[in-house]
């Protein structure tokens, strides 16, 4: 991984230096003061008493930051709170974790210093590339930093993720998640460093789409295609022929409504992998004409899974697109039908719940992404 990151980032010139954010045992702040805000924030008082993980009341943090007189000072106050929270997280995780910063990217990990340095630089570079690939669609958050927490082991990773996951039992395995609750951040596992690069690209794409109320399938389709555009996938665990057969056997007129509503992405079975792959294929096909596709993305509404926007901007029926992929039909039985959805639709990068990725997600073959309209 380190060689790849260095090759991406250090190919020309000397990059800006990274910074180790000092976090000795007594450095987790209990009170925050910021320019332009009269009253300090009692940070200790708003930290939750949740076992294991210190999490502040982010609504109170936001109210405090908004009391600053201008947007620049508001963003500065929010950034102070982010670093304060990560300092408390570092203490909770243990002294082997360290906080590293490069421009607006923050990394909390126990990676070796040179790997942490390359990773945080990769985050900064990736953000710029996402903005170019998703021209006119991507919009980085105006507040705060891009935050990545790399957990040393799967047990700690899932124990942390469980705090944000609905108490509904089994959930899909994952390599990384975008936690879009309170302070938006990304989490990944350290076990397989080869997976960190695509996970960073995937999750940072979600962060750049957070301003759009788009359906989950489009959110995930954009993230997977952008990930593969920036970091080509490794060998697939399934051949294209095998995947095609899996799709044809799995999807039914009833299950496709789970896909359109976003709930199939939360399945713990093969439906999770197939949902990401179907989203990838649909997005790649629709993005061939970027100008029209961009209009579609900006107007797509999760309430109808983007059906109306697809007709208006692209002149296509979503049900017909699925039928064309797998020889299903008739199209009207496969298009989004919100009246048949059992739950409220999901946006993707799941708010309050989280993005789930099957172990095979990052090994899905690139397929049409080499010819899709992603720039």
Mark where each language-model region is.
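Juxtacatalytic substrate-recognition/specificity segment
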Residues: 94-215, 305-313
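Short, charge-rich amphipathic segments
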Residues: 45-68, 128-130, 158-159, 210-217, ...
């Amino acid at each position: 991984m380190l060689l790849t990151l260095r090759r991406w980032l250090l190919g020309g010139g000397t990059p800006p230096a990274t910074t180790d954010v000092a976090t000795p045992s007594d450095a987790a702040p209990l009170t925050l003061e910021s320019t332009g805000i009269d009253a300090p924030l009692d940070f200790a008082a708003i930290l939750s008493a949740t076992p294991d993980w210190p999490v502040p009341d982010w609504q109170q943090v936001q109210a405090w930051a908004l009391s600053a007189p201008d947007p620049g000072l508001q963003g500065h106050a929010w950034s102070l709170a982010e670093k304060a929270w990560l300092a408390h997280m570092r203490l909770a995780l243990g002294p082997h974790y360290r906080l590293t910063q490069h421009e607006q990217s923050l990394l909390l990990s126990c990676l070796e210093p040179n790997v942490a340095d390359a990773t945080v630089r990769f985050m900064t570079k990736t953000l710029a590339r996402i903005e170019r690939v998703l021209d006119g669609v991507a919009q980085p958050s105006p507040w705060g930093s891009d935050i990545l927490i790399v957990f040393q082991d799967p047990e700690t990773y899932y124990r942390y993720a469980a705090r944000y996951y609905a108490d509904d039992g089994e959930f899909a395995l994952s390599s990384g998640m975008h936690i879009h609750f309170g302070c938006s951040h990304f989490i990944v596992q350290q076990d397989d460093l080869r997976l960190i690069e695509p996970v960073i690209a995937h999750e940072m794409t979600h962060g750049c789409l957070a301003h759009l109320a788009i359906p989950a399938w489009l959110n995930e389709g954009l993230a997977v295609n952008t990930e593969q555009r920036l970091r080509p996938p490794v060998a697939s665990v399934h051949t294209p022929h095998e995947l095609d057969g899996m799709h044809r056997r799995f999807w039914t007129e009833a299950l496709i409504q789970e896909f359109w509503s976003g709930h199939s992405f939360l399945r713990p079975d093969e439906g999770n992998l197939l949902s990401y792959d179907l989203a990838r294929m649909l997005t790649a096909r629709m993005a061939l004409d970027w100008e029209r596709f961009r209009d579609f993305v900006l107007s797509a509404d999760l309430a109808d899974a983007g059906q109306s926007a697809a007709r208006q901007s692209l002149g296509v029926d979503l049900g017909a697109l699925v039928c064309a992929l797998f020889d299903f039909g008739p199209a009207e039985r496969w298009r989004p039908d919100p009246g048949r959805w059992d739950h409220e639709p999901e946006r993707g990068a799941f708010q309050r719940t989280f993005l789930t990725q099957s172990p095979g997600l990052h090994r899905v073959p690139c397929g049409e992404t080499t010819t899709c309209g992603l720039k």
